[in-house]
């Protein structure tokens, strides 16, 4: 793009023999009324516009940073018109929501603490090469526009996608390259003062091809391999951050003097600590979540009342100080004594239980419980034509495996809104979905659309990883032949820096909800007994040393192995499919026979479905999936399809239960098989009229009536002459 005031910088991403990419940052021309705006290009033909705007005054009566990130997918970016009724974009797609989360997670902690002005980042996909993914480009675009907005922001942030292809980590892989990779991850980070890169966010998974590639000799994405991928991402992140810094230097902007609201002042903290510390130390040793929370609430209310006169109109500060004292107590006990809130050690897992087949009539169900976290998994199977059709900018057009996650308010003992899923629920469902996709059977091996629903009916730490475990159990209970069982665990981290600047780190296995809130890291790892299938990392620290992260991964592997043992005791192989589940069989026909099976205006396929009660789905390659409530209906439909696509000439003497399809003055045409009719002459109908001559066919037969007939003659042209098959003949046979 060219124009007055336009400035740009470029970052070169060099993957050696596997290709080079150019990320171009532009600013100064578009969206000039936003506080900060930038256009970011990937290889010249993918373009995203990001605009960051901040409210001029802080919001009243809130105790959080009101940051909103929106990703707008414009279908014109791919040269398409939206397929909706109104032919315009509506609510954001799931892919856009997930992209929002990818941006928000590293962006939010980079703002100064205590900011209360509303900040909105809007990223619009303007042009998209279908061979690339736009989500990581969006991270860089959002960072660039925010860097230029004059906000108290400690960026810039660089975001990259890394794929493991033939033992090499490739940055910004294409869609086709990702299909050949064994592991794929999005990594975001920023450059520290010493030049090192701090990893702030990771979203990663094995690919659908991983299982086959590993069996073929490729490197499995083990914990050690994943750790090398994070290190491989750092140089690319630095290149992207350097380009953003260079562009910001060309368009300097003073940081606005935004009011920053401290959670509390020192005098309030000292008073709260004096009054609450001893009793809080006792309360934070109560293992039961609800009992502990009730005790905390009672103590906080009492402290507020006692300090109300001393600190009038500073109730919010008292609450903030109370939380800070609680955090200090919990962290000190964990770091000094190695004892957690519920009495466990750093590596201990809460009590586990697993059970399958707990809900009647559904195709598969399971209950997985870890401490007070309780997840109900329910599996549903159906025809492939029920897979989700996607009209988005995603390279995927359909989704065969659909994973939905629900977390009702009662799961935490609270009231609240129920209904359409929030961004968090969509993100958790997607994480569990990605954890299971690598072990799902192929369409050819298991021709079903699969929907998995995870109901988080009790929550106290990592319901998303509990959903992975419950889903594995439910899918096996439904008869899905998984390649391996998958389990997940959430890891935490607490750290402390001494006077000499040395930092002590302690990784925690199976964190509670409180440990997540009071800790420094949320690290979710899912996988089989052999390799990692998905992971998600968010940290509040400037960075995590490689050895600490490697240790946490190893600790997660130990926990995952223990959980898999409990799950395997409940079910370790696919059950028989439920009687209520559809039976699907596969037929392969020549491609040139597809039209005959469908028939004019769908007449033939509709007739087969009406006659058998089966549901039929035809693929472009001639694969036909036949689904029915019982095996007999499916087999009947298969026989009728084979009769059309692979016809065999009927022989004299063969009997059929046929259907009258047409009556004439000289007889009735009877359908024996799809595409095979025979003539029952009027002279052969005496048995239908007590042995008397039939004057009109309509007197004894009507269209749609079923009759037992026998082939009496096949002429040279293949036309069939029929006679009635008598009950006596049937009895003789």
Curated annotation (Swiss-Prot):
Chief location: cytoplasm
UniProt cross-references to InterPro entries, sorted A to Z: ExoRNase_PH_dom1 (IPR001247), ExoRNase_PH_dom2_sf (IPR036345), GPSI/PNP (IPR014069), KH_dom (IPR004087), KH_dom_type_1 (IPR004088), KH_dom_type_1_sf (IPR036612), NA-bd_OB-fold (IPR012340), PNPase (IPR012162)
Disordered, as annotated region: 404-424
Family from the record: Belongs to the polyribonucleotide nucleotidyltransferase family.
Catalytic activity: RNA(n+1) + phosphate = RNA(n) + a ribonucleoside 5'-diphosphate
One term of GO molecular function: magnesium ion binding
Enzyme class: transferase
SUPFAM superfamilies listed in its UniProt record: Eukaryotic type KH-domain (KH-domain type I), Nucleic acid-binding proteins, Polynucleotide phosphorylase/guanosine pentaphosphate synthase (PNPase/GPSI), domain 3, Ribonuclease PH domain 2-like, Ribosomal protein S5 domain 2-like
S1 motif domain residues: 653-725
The protein's name in its UniProt record: Polyribonucleotide nucleotidyltransferase
This protein's GO CC annotations: cytosol
EC assignment: 2.7.7.8
Function: Involved in mRNA degradation. Catalyzes the phosphorolysis of single-stranded polyribonucleotides processively in the 3'- to 5'-direction.
Residues reported to bind Mg(2+): 516, 522
Cofactor(s) for this UniProt protein: Mg(2+)
UniProt keyword annotations, A-Z: Cytoplasm, Magnesium, Metal-binding, Nucleotidyltransferase, RNA-binding, Transferase
Pfam families to which the protein is assigned, alphabetical: KH_1, PNPase, RNase_PH, S1
Domain KH: 582-641
Keyword Plastid attached: no
Name of the coding gene: pnp
Keyword presence, Magnesium: yes
Locations listed in the record: Cytoplasm
PROSITE patterns: KH_TYPE_1, S1
């Amino acid at each position: 793009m060219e124009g007055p005031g336009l400035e740009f910088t470029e970052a070169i991403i060099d993957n050696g023999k596997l290709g080079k990419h150019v990320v171009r940052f532009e600013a100064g021309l578009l969206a000039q009324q936003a506080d900060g705006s930038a256009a970011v290009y990937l290889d010249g033909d993918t373009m995203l516009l990001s605009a960051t705007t901040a409210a001029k005054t802080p919001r009243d009566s809130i105790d959080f940073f009101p940051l909103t990130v929106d990703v707008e997918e414009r279908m014109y970016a791919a040269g398409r018109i939206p397929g909706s009724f109104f032919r315009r974009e509506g609510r954001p797609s799931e892919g856009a929501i997930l992209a929002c989360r990818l941006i928000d997670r590293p962006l939010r902690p980079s703002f100064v603490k205590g900011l209360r002005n509303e900040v909105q980042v809007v990223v619009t996909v303007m042009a998209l090469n279908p061979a690339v993914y736009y989500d990581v480009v969006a991270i860089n675009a959002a960072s660039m526009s925010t860097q230029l907005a004059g906000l108290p922001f400690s960026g810039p942030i660089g975001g990259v996608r890394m794929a493991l292809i033939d033992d090499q980590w490739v940055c910004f892989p294409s869609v086709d390259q990702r299909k050949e990779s064994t592991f794929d991850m999005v990594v975001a980070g920023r450059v520290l003062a010493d030049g090192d890169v701090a990893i702030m966010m990771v979203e990663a998974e094995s690919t659908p091809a991983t299982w086959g590639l590993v069996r073929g000799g490729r490197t499995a994405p083990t914990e050690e391999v994943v750790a090398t991928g994070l290190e491989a991402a750092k140089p690319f992140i630095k290149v992207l951050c350097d380009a953003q810094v260079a562009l910001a230097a060309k368009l300097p902007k003073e940081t606005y003097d935004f009011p920053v609201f401290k959670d509390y002042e020192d005098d309030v903290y000292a008073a709260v600590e004096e009054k609450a510390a001893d009793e809080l130390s006792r309360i934070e040793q109560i293992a039961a979540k609800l009992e502990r929370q009730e005790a905390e609430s009672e103590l906080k209310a009492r402290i507020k009342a006692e300090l109300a006169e001393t600190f009038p109109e500073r109730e919010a500060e008292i609450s903030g100080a109370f939380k800070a004292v609680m955090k200090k107590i919990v962290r000190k006990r964990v770091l000094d004594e190695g004892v957690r809130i519920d009495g466990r050690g750093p590596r201990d897992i809460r009590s586990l239980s697993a059970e399958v087949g707990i809900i009647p009539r559904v195709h598969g169900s399971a209950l997985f419980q870890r401490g007070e976290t309780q997840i109900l998994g329910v599996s549903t199977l159906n025809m492939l034509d029920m897979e989700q059709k996607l009209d988005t900018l995603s390279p995927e057009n359909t989704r065969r495996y659909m994973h939905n996650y629900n977390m009702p308010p009662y799961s935490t003992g609270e009231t609240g809104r129920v209904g359409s899923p929030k961004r968090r629920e969509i993100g958790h469902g997607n994480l569990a979905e990605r954890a299971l996709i690598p072990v799902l059977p192929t369409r050819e091996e298991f021709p079903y659309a699969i929907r998995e629903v995870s109901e988080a009916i009790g929550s106290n730490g990592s319901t998303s990883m509990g959903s992975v475990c419950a889903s594995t159990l439910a899918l096996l209970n439904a008869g899905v032949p998984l390649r391996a069982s998958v389990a997940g665990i959430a890891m935490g981290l607490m750290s402390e820096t001494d006077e000499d600047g040395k930092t002590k780190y302690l990784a925690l296995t199976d964190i509670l909800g409180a440990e997540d809130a009071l800790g420094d890291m949320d690290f979710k790892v899912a996988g089989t007994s052999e390799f990692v299938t998905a992971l998600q990392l968010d940290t509040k620290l400037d960075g995590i040393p490689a050895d600490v992260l490697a240790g946490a991964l190893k600790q997660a592997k130990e926990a995952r192995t223990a959980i898999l043992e409990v799950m395997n005791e409940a079910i370790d192989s696919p059950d028989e499919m439920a009687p209520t589940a559809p039976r699907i069989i596969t037929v392969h026909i020549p491609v040139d026979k597809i039209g005959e099976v469908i028939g004019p205006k769908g007449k033939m396929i509709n007739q087969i479905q009406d006659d058998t009660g089966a549901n039929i789905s035809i693929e472009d390659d001639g694969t036909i999936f036949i689904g029915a409530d019982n095996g007999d209906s499916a087999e009947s439909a298969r026989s009728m399809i084979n009769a059309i696509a692979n016809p065999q000439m009927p022989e004299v003497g063969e009997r059929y239960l046929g259907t009258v399809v047409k009556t004439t003055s000289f007889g009735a045409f009877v359908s024996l098989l799809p595409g095979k009719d025979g003539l029952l002459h009027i002279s052969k109908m005496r048995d239908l009229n007590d042995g008397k001559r039939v004057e009109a066919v309509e007197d004894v037969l009507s269209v749609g009536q079923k009759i037992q007939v026998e082939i009496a003659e096949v002429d040279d042209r293949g036309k069939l002459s029929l006679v009635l098959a008598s009950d006596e003949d049937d009895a003789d046979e």
